[in-house]
């Protein structure tokens, strides 16, 4: 992995107010970096949550605290003009109360008094086609639930030795979540 290019691309995404493209970054850098090189870098191999952990692990170790909080979130990157696929599809957006077309992704932040760092993520893939009985239309659904993704991310945080006191999540947890070597009881208010 080309860490300097990854850092540059991440900075570009964070600092941009509008649409971001490889061509846009190349233009911003006055063609000192070709858009083809950026595109090749982005399509080299799938970037996983484990890759993210390897990058942020040294930072987490510097700031880790027993009273840290894991904040899990569910977001949608809107892609209204892109063709539907396993990754890009229709998702219910709780902020607008409507279905929107885009990429649904789940994130986990490790938050201390000092900083918030991303430590895990999952992409919601609607990898199964089915026929809606009411409309007769072909639709897509995920074979792995968001709850299962959240549990996987939580287990990874425990396995990676991140100390934390609380977990904040946007979905209702199951009664018992097996995490690491023990079970953690969850309660709904």
Put a short name on every predicted segment:
Residues 1-188:
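Conserved, well-structured functional cores that handle cations and Mg-NTP chemistry
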């Amino acid at each position: 992995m080309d860490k300097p290019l990854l850092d540059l691309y991440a900075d570009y995404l964070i600092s941009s107010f509008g649409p971001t493209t490889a061509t846009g970054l190349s233009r911003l850098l006055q063609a000192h970096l070709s858009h083809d090189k950026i595109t090749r870098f982005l399509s080299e191999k799938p970037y996983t949550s484990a890759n993210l952990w390897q990058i942020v692990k040294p930072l987490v170790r510097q700031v880790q605290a027993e009273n840290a909080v894991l904040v899990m979130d569910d977001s949608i990157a809107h892609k209204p003009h892109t063709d539907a696929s396993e990754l890009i599809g229709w998702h219910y957006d709780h902020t607008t109360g409507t279905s929107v077309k885009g990429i649904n992704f789940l994130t986990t932040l490790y938050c201390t008094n000092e900083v918030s760092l991303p430590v895990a993520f999952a992409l919601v893939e609607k990898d199964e086609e089915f026929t809606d009985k009411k409309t007769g239309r072909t639709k897509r659904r995920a074979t792995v639930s968001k709850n299962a993704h959240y549990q996987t991310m939580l287990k990874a945080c425990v396995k990676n030795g991140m100390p934390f006191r609380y977990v904040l999540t946007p979905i209702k947890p199951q009664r018992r979540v097996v995490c690491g070597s023990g079970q953690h009881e969850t309660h709904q208010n």
